[in-house]
Amino acid sequence: MKLLFELSGEHPDLPAAELECVGTVLDRRTQVAVAECPDPEAVGRLALTHVVMEYLGECEPSKEGLTGLLRDLAIRTEKPFAGRVKLIQGAHMDAARLEVEKLIGGLIAGPVSLRDPVEEYRAVVSDDRCYFGRVIARIDRGGFEFRNPMRRPFFHPGVMMPRMGRALVNISLVRPGELIFDPFCGTGGILLEAREIGVRVLGSDFDPVMVAGYRQNLPGSDVMIADATAVPVCDGALDSVVTDLPYGQSVRIHGESMDRLYDGSLAEIRRILKPGRRAVVVTHRDITPIAARHFTILQEHEQRVHKSLTRRILVLG
């Protein structure tokens, strides 16, 4: 099924990269993407998307262009519906938003209900294109807020927020029922997001305090105290690895140097990851020369967290 995605503006690239877990991206504009998705219900796992629509068509961003598209579509519905318009980051049409919404309502055969619609038809204008679709899902962000690290039984500062953790799990392309591993699991934030979408999880950390905290946050999930450069896991046993590599003075590190730790842990990830599968690694400085010794670098992203912290995200295969 061809779907239209209205993406979050939290990052210029990560929302579109995340879509690979549900389909093949066919077209992309600012905060908008079109993808072919074999299972539309899978979109519920996404973290960096706002609205998902059945793709109905596209046109130039003008009243005339949308009129022609709607006449060609000749949509009929018995359900009460509303027409909405979304202008992305300064995009514009040659008519006011309310006028365009009225146009949509007038060219779809069916009962209009702005207060209590059962269906919503949405025109999304981005850059030089107007996309049109029927809303089939809105991503519930309340669940992510409910899993805020401050709400967990065990809290440790500096942990990744749930939406970003989920996005990284999705970018790894792991599927429900498969096994994901985090060799620097800390209090379990990344694996908590993986478990929420039906993925089997395994964590390890060298710090017994973090492992104890993990057990509080993810009761019943497998975790072990282990050196990330020598993990007691068989070769090619894992479907996915997602991890936030340690940094700074606030973490307990086993190894002669940070570079040695990174090199050893990436070599170990390579060993235990199934051939053809992905690892997603977050760092806080450039380690591409180290990563390139063990993997092909498929994607690189940067995310500014605050003035003194920029995350570097490597997708490895």
Specify the residue positions occupied by each region the protein language model found.
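Class I S-adenosyl-L-methionine-dependent methyltransferase catalytic core
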Residues: 1-53, 61, 65, 69, ...
